[in-house]
Amino acid sequence: MELIPNLPDDVARECLLRSSYQQFPVIASVCRAWNREVSLSQFLHQRKASRHSQELLILSQARVDPAGSGKIIATPEYRISVLESGSGLWTELPPIPGQTKGLPLFCRLVSVGSDLIVLGGLDPITWQAHDSVFVFSFLTSKWRVGATMPGVRRSFFGCASDSDRTVLVAGGHNEEKCALTSAMVYDVSEDKWTFLPDMARERDECKAVFHAGRFHVIGGYATEEQGQFSKTAESFDVSTWEWGPLTEDFLDDTGDTVSPPTCVAGGDLYACWGGDVMMFLNDKWQKVGQIPADVYNVTYVAVRPGMLIVIGNGKALAGYGEATVGYICDLSSSRWVKLETHGGHVQAGCFLEV
């Protein structure tokens, strides 16, 4: 059966490749052949290779009072905002079914293929830890419930994705506020969790990135340290299924008291702290830029080809409804361009290319 009557399939496929991601659910509903075509992993690879893919900045963001009162909300309601970087268009994802009070507070967001994964967090009413996993498909524009996180209910854990198939989780604390050494991996396609060997030390409020085939867990603090963030890091090699040796002074040059927002791109590791953009070069951190002065408390940082994206909150005493501040930096010229942003405090974010 032809994809489009009276057109060669390669021409019809080119038409589908040029479609906006927002049209995918409609395309998939037209017929089985189109549904099958856009569901293939090769379809996404071809979109990227032909430069028809769209880059989406996805944020967990507090809903702003529509009346514009400017009041600080004691327990804000969070939703998922999406920026299509090519057009500058902001949209919102449909709410997660059954989550009438918005997203779990402090949940983690990661992307795997064309899916957005929402993990854990705290119940907005009871503040009890969630072990929930929700998966949003940008191909169908629908949510599904994933397998719950096994073991103790944890919050404030480090989380990263290999961008292809799996999500890795480490550290955080349990419901007794005890920091954890445990780690695990979620296979999105199989909807299955598997425990990893434990880390060398407890890591509450740690940061995590996936880089060069390794899951890196950075900073955090042990139960007895309570907020005294470690400068150490350790990495898990997914090919050998082993943790490497502890790196004692990985963050020794930061001068910061928390684990800084960190990201990876093109084999390079970046972090933001103290108003500076830092890059890990030759086994040490080096300053490569300065964050614009009106960005307070960086909540998310990402690097894309040739550019750095920084999202933060605007003022030191800002309420949850305060306008988010975002910038894109051209890495070749170090020039910052301000983003048009939604209002509302940002807790988490991720990038997805579809």
Curated annotation (Swiss-Prot):
> Which Gene3D superfamilies does the record associate with it?
Kelch-type beta propeller
One GO cellular component assignment for this chain's record is: SCF ubiquitin ligase complex
Q: Which residues form the F-box domain?
A: 2-49
Spell out the residue ranges that the record assigns to Kelch repeats: 63-110, 115-163, 166-213, 215-263
Membrane-spanning parts: none
- What is any one GO biological process for this UniProt entry? regulation of phenylpropanoid metabolic process
Domain of life per record: Eukaryota
Database matches in InterPro entries: F-box-like_dom_sf, F-box_dom, Kelch-typ_b-propeller, Kelch_1, KMD1-4
Q: Which UniProt keywords apply?
A: Kelch repeat, Repeat
What's the protein called, per UniProt?
F-box/kelch-repeat protein At1g80440
Q: What taxonomic lineage is listed for the species of origin? A: Eukaryota, Viridiplantae, Streptophyta, Embryophyta, Tracheophyta
